[in-house]
């Protein structure tokens, strides 16, 4: 791939080889090619003067040696295509590879919440491809995404009947908090709606018919409104909501009134004129797509609907009851049409003769920015469809077109190829837009949320004949594509490595340190230290004129401007900076694409050099350096021989450099740097990380005199880990306090030392606990100074308000892996608990360890919470929030298990872990504390959380005991859980109402017969307890229902299993179903007793006459009525099941007229086939009836 195309696709330079700096900088300056604050291989940072490597490097291997082909049948030269998640369920594979009629109508969808489904005819196959509760963090997603060996469990549902078939876009699968099994709602194209409260039970569904005569094409979930929005091909909207009435789910719908703007009603005739369409005045508008644009603080949701006529923006209230059309903008489409003409045909044909056909293909809204994929054909010029990506933002009264990006992927357009030309779709990721057809994916790079793909992108081809892409989604910033042949696959640029981000000191995931203003003040700096250190700083001795003349590259020029700033020569500063800004924004003379991050790379290069510059006056370093000239222009060097003074000089020089960036207005031009293939890190945050590592080094050096042996051992282990060896008279400490790029590794070394000391002990002793205490104190002291510095100097690294919402905030102290400290902190917590606090009895030491554990937990959670706040409006927020909540609960539980309730409560209160707070109140039996939390966290609905917690613990009774003083909370709880309202009635002594509520709940119960029996039994008890009321009639109804339940319980397990029922957890069966199971052919052991029970159940059937006939026919078919000895007909008859049923009925005192149907019913029965026409059957049947008539005669009526 050519370099300009590489830059176009990935927004980075690939000009340097592994180990070299990837800044596209000239190497004229020796000091600009020396070392990196972001680490890398030690072999790339030796004192031999080899080029250094930075975190802006996006791979350890060049593209020429990196394999990107992962799956046979998918061709990609520069991207890695890997299988994602578990293998597809077998039944899904069978549906996808189905080759019969209708195979081409199979559709599929993959969603961000981890669920996927396939639609084949009326079959809906649902499975969970990713467990969002256990997914890994995004930096590790490259490793976690690889396919495991287990199969995902698939659920099959039956869709409602539809003449127009079913589409996967009209289905939504979701799982709410506390719900064990997902729910599903489906809308057919003809408007038949079906809702399943649990996808595990196909038969338990609710149906509704809406807006007949229309064709529905898309279903949109509205979480705020707890509903759904269905849209037809003509942009008619229907709001759907699932309700719960008396414990039974119901569906409700509301048709959104159509727009009455100038494009609605009679104004439709003018729409085509206004936007230039030649499609006929009477043609209805056609839907392109519908998106949930934003959720406002008021609870309202903004929905955007794009058609081929206009774009509508609707506002829906938080309860979905009211809607408001904000506006309908047709001018947006006119502007898109004009952009096509301007960019593709303006210079080829006279503008007056241009008539183009505009096609809007796909529509998405991401972070309040609208993305539209459009195509246009100028038939008069050439039968070719041209494509473009359009971005826009919503204004108060119209849509603002922000950008129009032509795409060089033209297709031949004809009647035969029209479907293929119009099939292009796209998904929007954090750093790329992925265009795709059924066979090809085009990854296009995003810069500031705008596509920059004017060149043709690389094609990722799914080239197997029977393969095609069925769906695509962005999940946790990872693009996933659902292939008919390969299932779910992920696509990442070929230079991406899931572990690489973890190995880079400050480029893990996008982060954002989020202060409020841009003020370059270092007001809290120690001015006395500044004065005292001035004589040691080498930068005051450097001649700016000499540097300006000698170093002609951009790095050298900006260094010179910095020195002029220190000399207060503002004219030269302005001259150099202006020229530099012109150069970095000018077009490349060779025609290569402009490097959008060039200025950021220059600034970070200088900051890295400053942080790792060696002390210029130390003769030991002169001896170690092969090239003495490479340190001559070092602006971070100190003349001091003491390490602590060298570090202080560096932080002062760094502060001067940041002040220079602000005063020269260079800071306002800084943006971001690509870190890995999917991450953009703000330059201001990278600079903050660099300065904080200098401060951390100062803090460690300051306490080294207190614990010299331990810290020296950790430093030696850290430098050895870097594969560095001191040369000449240099020591490990000299190297460590210069190589600050990987300073965080010293914390890992301290944890390793603790493990080694523990492993060396035969048993845990108090000395180990003291040792762990010392290590914790080092870590906490150092990080305490870092956080203090971060707070004091936040304004110096603050981003502008415009850039603030665009980036994420993940400081190095919160990063996982070797790039940060978070994993080490978690490890120290575990060590402190297992080998510290649990193993000592000394009160003071034990309390010190718990205090340290408390502080370590606070550091871990604070970093994760800060990061979580910065990604609130991104795709990965839900996944990261679940991870945060899981780790929060796990860490606080450590303190709760050890009964450190006060520490646990402080953490839980700070990070709003309500589950831990309720658990603390429960274990301490502190009812007052629970009431205090209810008042304190009223805005978070703490009382409802606490009540639900008790329910999950199966402690229903305690809810009313503990919250009886909070009637408001109980009332709200009863409204949300109507199936438990009877408990409060019991507590209040209202047994009559409790009996009625329980009986109503039992009538609504259709899932588990055991639950229905319990409800009926409780209702009967409540009725008996209502001594003052006469509930005889209700008790009789209850007894009748209990009798029906008892009949069901007597069914054999074999017959239940043969019909697919679970004998252990039986669902509620109707009387007709129970009868059918009693008399079924599969019930081979059924005797006259089972058939008698079936007859007894006729009183529960709406049409008993027909069912009685069915029972007797089933009994007749059990025996042979034609092959018998006529001489012994009576004897043979008495062995028939038919006769035995009559006989047992007679013994039980039943009248034959009520038991037996008329004989003519059997002689004319269709169910018996040709048996009634056979004479032997007729004879034996008539004999039976005659014999039975005599048997049922009363003794007084018999003649002697």
Swiss-Prot record:
Any one GO BP annotation for this protein: transcription-dependent tethering of RNA polymerase II gene DNA at nuclear periphery
Keywords recorded for this protein, A-Z: mRNA transport, Nuclear pore complex, Nucleus, Protein transport, Translocation, Transport
Localisation: Nucleus, Nuclear pore complex
Pfam families for the chain: Nucleoporin_N (PF08801)
GO MF annotations, alphabetized: structural constituent of nuclear pore
Region of interest (Disordered), residue spans: 1-28
Subunit structure: Forms part of the Nup107-Nup160 subcomplex in the nuclear pore.
Protein name: Nuclear pore complex protein Nup133
Top-level taxonomy: Eukaryota, Metazoa, Ecdysozoa, Arthropoda, Hexapoda
């Amino acid at each position: 791939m050519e370099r300009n195309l590489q830059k176009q696709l990935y927004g980075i330079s690939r000009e340097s080889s592994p180990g070299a700096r990837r800044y596209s900088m000239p190497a004229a300056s020796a000091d600009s090619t020396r070392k990196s604050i972001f680490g890398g291989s030690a072999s790339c940072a030796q004192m031999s003067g080899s080029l250094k490597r930075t975190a802006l490097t996006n791979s350890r291997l060049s593209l020429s040696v990196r394999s990107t082909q992962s799956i046979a049948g998918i061709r990609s030269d520069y991207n890695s295509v890997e299988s994602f998640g578990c293998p597809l369920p077998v039944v899904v594979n069978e549906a996808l590879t189905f080759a019969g009629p209708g195979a081409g109508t199979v559709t599929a969808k993959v969603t961000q919440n981890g669920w996927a489904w396939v639609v084949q005819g009326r079959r809906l196959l649902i499975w969970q491809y990713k467990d969002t509760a256990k997914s890994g963090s995004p930096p590790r997603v490259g490793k976690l995404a690889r396919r495991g060996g287990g199969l995902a469990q698939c659920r099959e549902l039956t869709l409602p009947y539809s003449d127009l078939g079913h589409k996967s876009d009209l289905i939504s699968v979701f799982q709410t908090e506390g719900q064990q099994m997902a729910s599903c709602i489906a809308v057919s194209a003809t408007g038949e709606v079906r809702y399943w409260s649990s996808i595990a039970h196909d038969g338990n569904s609710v149906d509704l018919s809406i807006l007949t005569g229309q064709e529905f094409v898309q279903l949109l979930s509205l979480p705020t409104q707890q509903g759904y929005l269905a849209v037809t091909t003509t942009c008619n909207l229907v709001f759907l909501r699932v309700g719960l009435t008396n414990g039974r789910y119901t569906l409700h719908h509301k048709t959104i009134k159509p727009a009455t703007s100038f494009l609605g009603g009679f104004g439709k005739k003018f729409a085509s004129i206004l936007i230039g369409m030649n499609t006929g005045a009477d043609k209805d508008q056609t839907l392109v797509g519908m998106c949930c644009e934003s959720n406002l603080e008021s609870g309202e949701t903004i929905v955007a609907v794009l058609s081929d006529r206009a774009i509508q923006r609707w506002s829906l209230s938080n309860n979905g009851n009211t809607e408001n059309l904000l506006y309908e903008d047709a001018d947006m489409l006119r502007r898109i049409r004009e952009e096509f003409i301007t960019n593709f045909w303006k210079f080829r044909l006279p503008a007056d003769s241009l008539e183009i056909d505009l096609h809007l293909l796909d529509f998405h809204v991401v972070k309040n920015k609208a993305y539209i994929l459009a195509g246009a054909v100028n038939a008069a010029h050439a039968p070719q469809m041209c494509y473009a990506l359009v971005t826009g933002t919503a204004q108060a009264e119209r849509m603002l077109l922000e950008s129009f990006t032509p795409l060089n992927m033209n297709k031949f357009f004809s009647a035969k190829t029209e479907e293929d030309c119009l099939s292009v779709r796209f998904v929007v990721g954090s750093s790329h837009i992925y265009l795709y057809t059924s066979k090809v994916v085009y990854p296009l790079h995003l810069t500031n949320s705008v596509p920059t793909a004017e060149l043709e992108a690389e094609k990722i081809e799914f080239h197997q004949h029977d393969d095609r892409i069925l769906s695509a989604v962005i999940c946790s910033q990872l693009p996933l594509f659902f292939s008919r042949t390969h299932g779910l696959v992920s696509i990442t640029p070929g230079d991406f490595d899931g572990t690489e981000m973890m190995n880079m000191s400050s480029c893990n995931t996008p982060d954002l340190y989020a202060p409020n203003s841009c003020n370059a003040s270092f007001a809290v700096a120690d001015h006395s230290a500044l004065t005292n250190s001035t004589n040691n700083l080498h930068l005051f001795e450097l001649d700016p004129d000499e540097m300006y003349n000698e170093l002609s590259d951009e790095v050298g020029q900006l260094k010179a401007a910095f020195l002029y700033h220190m000399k207060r020569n503002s004219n030269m500063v302005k001259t150099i900076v202006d020229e530099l800004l012109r150069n970095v924004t000018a077009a490349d003379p060779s025609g290569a694409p402009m490097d959008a991050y060039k200025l950021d790379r220059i600034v970070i290069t200088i900051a890295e050099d400053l942080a790792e510059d060696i002390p210029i006056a130390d003769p030991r370093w002169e001896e170690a350096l092969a090239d003495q000239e490479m340190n001559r222009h070092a602006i971070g060097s100190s003349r001091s021989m003491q390490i602590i003074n060298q570090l202080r000089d560096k932080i002062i020089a760094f502060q001067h450099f940041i002040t220079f960036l602000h005063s020269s207005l260079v800071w306002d031009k800084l943006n971001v740097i690509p870190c890995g293939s999917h991450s953009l890190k703000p330059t201001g945050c990278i600079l903050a990380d660099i300065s904080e590592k200098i401060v951390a080094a100062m803090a460690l050096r300051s306490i080294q005199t207190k614990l010299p042996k331990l810290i020296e051992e950790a430093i030696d282990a850290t430098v050895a880990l870097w594969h560095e060896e001191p040369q000449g008279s240099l020591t490990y400490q000299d190297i460590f306090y210069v190589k600050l790029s990987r300073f965080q590794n010293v914390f890992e070394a301290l944890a390793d030392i603790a493990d080694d000391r523990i492993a060396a002990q035969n048993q845990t002793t108090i000395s180990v606990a003291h040792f762990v205490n010392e290590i914790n104190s080092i870590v906490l002291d150092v990080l305490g100074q870092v956080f203090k510095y971060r707070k004091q100097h936040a304004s110096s690294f603050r981003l502008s308000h415009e850039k603030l919402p665009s980036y994420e905030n993940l400081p190095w102290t919160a990063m996982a892996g070797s790039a940060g400290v978070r994993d080490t902190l978690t490890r120290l917590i575990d060590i402190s608990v297992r080998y510290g606090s649990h193993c000592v009895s000394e009160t003071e030491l034990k309390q010190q360890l718990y205090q340290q554990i408390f502080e370590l937990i606070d550091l871990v959670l604070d970093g994760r919470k800060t990061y979580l706040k910065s990604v609130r409006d991104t795709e990965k927020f839900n996944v990261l929030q679940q991870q945060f909540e899981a780790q929060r609960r796990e860490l606080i539980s450590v303190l709760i298990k050890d009964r450190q309730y006060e520490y646990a409560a402080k953490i839980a209160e700070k990070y709003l872990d309500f589950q831990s707070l309720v658990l603390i109140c429960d274990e301490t039996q502190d009812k007052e504390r629970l009431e205090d939390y209810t008042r304190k966290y009223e805005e978070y609905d703490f009382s409802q959380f606490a009540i639900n917690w008790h329910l999950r613990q199966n402690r229903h009774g305690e809810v009313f005991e503990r919250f009886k003083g909070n009637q408001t909370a109980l009332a709200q709880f009863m409204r949300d859980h109507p199936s438990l309202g009877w408990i409060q009635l019991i507590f209040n002594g209202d047994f009559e109402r409790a009996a009625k509520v329980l009986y109503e709940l039992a009538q609504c119960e259709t899932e588990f017969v055991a639950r229905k029996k319990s409800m009926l039994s409780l209702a009967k008890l409540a009725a008996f307890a209502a001594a003052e009321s006469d509930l005889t009639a209700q008790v009789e109804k209850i007894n009748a229902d209990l009798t029906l339940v008892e009949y069901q319980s007597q069914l054999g397990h074999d017959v239940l299993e043969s019909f697919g029922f679970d004998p252990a957890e039986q669902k509620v069966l109707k009387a007709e179903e129970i009868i059918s199971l009693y008399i079924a052919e599969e019930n081979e052991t059924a005797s006259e007793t089972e058939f008698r029970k079936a007859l007894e159940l006729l009183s529960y059937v709406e049409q008993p006459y027909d069912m009685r006939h069915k029972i007797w026919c089933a009994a007749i078919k059990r025996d042979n009525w034609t092959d018998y000895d006529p001489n012994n007909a009576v004897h043979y008859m008495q062995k028939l099941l038919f006769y035995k049923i009559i006989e047992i009925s007679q013994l039980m005192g039943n009248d034959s007229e009520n038991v037996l149907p008329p004989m003519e019913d059997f002689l004319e029965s269709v169910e018996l086939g040709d048996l009634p026409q056979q004479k032997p059957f007729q004879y034996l049947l008539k004999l039976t009836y005659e014999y039975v008539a005599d048997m049922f005669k009363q003794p007084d009526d018999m003649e002697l």
